[in-house]
């Protein structure tokens, strides 16, 4: 092959590779924009402060749940070590680890009133986490307090049980196969992988049930796996930074553990929240929904599409889940939830059993003008200025035309009826 042709072939091949990777780079930029809009860096700092108050109560509750089951009694010490290695890495200072263990041991001797106060502090952290996750998933309205309590109780009890059960199974496997004696290197690799899997289980539980929004199970699992791997990489990078680069010991002396611990908790929350943003954005990957802009006129079209789908399902006597709606409306689940919430506020739709949605009004009773005012433009009657009056005059003919068309008429025009 002539050199010129070889050079042209190389350029073409490189261009093809760049074109193939373009969706991944574009999706990464999309996630970065979402993190910036959600102020993940600032929220991580806020959660770091809240964690300082609630870390010991959460740690104590987790140990109390584990110790309540005799089958886990032999593994309580290992459970402590595993939790502390995640929450307080060894490079953050042995002083904090010793204090954490002392706090947890002393907390087990508390009276009923003291335990209640510990629970309240832990619930405060859970409430802050829920509000943060709801903001990431675009939830405007939280759960009722009774439903909130059920979610918090599930996380505070099921999380430690999942960790304890997984740890019990893991240690049984090691004991049955004698990996630690026969293949120590493989045992170390499997133990590191087991830590990632255990962390992913808890994160998947958080990502799946804490947001007041439908989160597909596979999205929660993928997001949790990616986040747990990032946590391990962050732990390694942070250890290198503290050991080789930073000079906290030189500046702070005996108090060096405190800023190191604060910085680690901040990094921990930063990775967890970044994983939550990644999990919420996974629904935008399907159908290249991340490429579109969620502008008012697009939400107007999405609302029409949702109503048409629910009208057709109503005629069949069915209800549609968010997953079924998402197959036709190419948006993220958070954006779809926002459209459904606005329609529900006006009484057009309602969520029924199992997150399924139904149409509450006849399609012939819903005109396009009302939907236009909900999602695109509504005149502010209290303004009374010249600009508002002029806009109302210009939009008058359009409003009249939309007023004459119902969702049922639209369905006939587009061949849905």
From Swiss-Prot:
Transmembrane helix as UniProt keyword: yes
* First-listed, main subcellular location of the protein, grouped into a coarse class: membrane
Domain of life, per UniProt, equals: Bacteria
For this protein, the record's InterPro entries field holds: UPF0761_bac, Virul_fac_BrkB
TM annotation in the entry = 52-72, 79-99, 110-130, 150-170, 185-205, 214-234, 258-278
Q: Name one Pfam family in it.
A: Virul_fac_BrkB
Report the subcellular localization: Cell inner membrane
Keyword entries, A-Z:
Cell inner membrane, Cell membrane, Membrane, Transmembrane, Transmembrane helix
Give the membrane topology.
Multi-pass membrane protein
- Keyword flag Transmembrane helix: yes
Q: Which GO terms describe its cellular component?
A: plasma membrane
Q: Which family does it belong to?
A: Belongs to the UPF0761 family.
The record's annotation in PANTHER family points to: INNER MEMBRANE PROTEIN YHJD (PTHR30213), UPF0761 MEMBRANE PROTEIN YIHY (PTHR30213:SF0)
Q: Which HAMAP family match?
A: UPF0761
Q: Entry's NCBIfam families? A: PRK04214.1, yihY_not_rbn
What is the designated name of this protein?
A: UPF0761 membrane protein CV_0810
Say which species the protein is native to.
Answer: Chromobacterium violaceum (strain ATCC 12472 / DSM 30191 / JCM 1249 / CCUG 213 / NBRC 12614 / NCIMB 9131 / NCTC 9757 / MK)
């Amino acid at each position: 092959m002539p050199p010129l042709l070889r050079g042209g072939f190389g350029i073409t091949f490189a261009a093809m590779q760049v074109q193939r990777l373009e969706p991944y780079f574009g999706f990464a930029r999309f996630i970065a924009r979402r993190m910036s809009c959600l102020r993940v860096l600032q929220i991580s700092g806020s959660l770091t402060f809240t964690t300082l108050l609630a870390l010991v109560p959460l740690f104590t509750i987790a140990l109390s749940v584990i110790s309540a089951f005799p089958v886990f009694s032999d593994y309580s010490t290992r459970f402590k070590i595993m939790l502390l290695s995640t929450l307080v890495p060894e490079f953050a200072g042995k002083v904090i680890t010793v204090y954490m263990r002392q706090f947890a041991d002393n907390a087990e001797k508390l009276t009923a009133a003291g335990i209640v106060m510990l629970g309240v502090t832990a619930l405060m952290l859970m409430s802050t986490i829920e509000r943060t996750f709801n903001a990431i998933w675009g939830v405007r309205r939280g759960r009722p307090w009774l439903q909130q309590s059920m979610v918090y109780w599930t996380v505070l009890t099921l999380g430690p049980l999942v960790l304890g059960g997984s740890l019990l199974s893991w240690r049984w496997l090691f004991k049955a196969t004698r990996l630690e004696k026969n293949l120590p290197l493989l045992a170390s690799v499997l133990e590191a992988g087991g830590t990632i899997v255990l962390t992913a289980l808890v994160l998947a539980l958080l990502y799946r049930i804490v947001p007041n929004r439908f989160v597909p199970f596979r999205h929660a699992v993928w997001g949790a796996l990616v986040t747990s791997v990032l946590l391990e990489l962050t732990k390694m990078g942070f250890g290198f930074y503290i050991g080789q680069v930073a000079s906290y010991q030189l500046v702070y002396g005996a108090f060096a553990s405190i800023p190191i611990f604060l910085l680690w908790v901040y990094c921990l929350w930063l990775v967890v929240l970044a994983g939550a943003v990644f999990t919420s954005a996974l629904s935008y990957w399907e159908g290249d929904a991340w490429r579109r802009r969620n502008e008012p006129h697009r939400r107007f079209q999405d609302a029409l599409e949702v109503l048409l789908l629910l009208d057709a399902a109503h005629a069949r006597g069915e209800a549609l889940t968010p997953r079924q709606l998402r197959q036709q409306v190419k948006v993220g689940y958070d954006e779809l939830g926002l459209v459904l919430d606005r329609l529900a506020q006006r009484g057009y739709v309602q969520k029924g059993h199992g997150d399924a949605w139904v149409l509450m009004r006849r399609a012939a009773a819903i005109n396009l003008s009302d939907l236009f005012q909900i999602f695109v433009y509504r005149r502010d009657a209290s303004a009374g200025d010249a600009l508002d009056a002029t806009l109302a005059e210009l939009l008058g003919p359009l409003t009249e035309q939309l007023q004459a068309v119902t969702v049922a008429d639209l369905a006939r025009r587009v061949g849905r009826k």
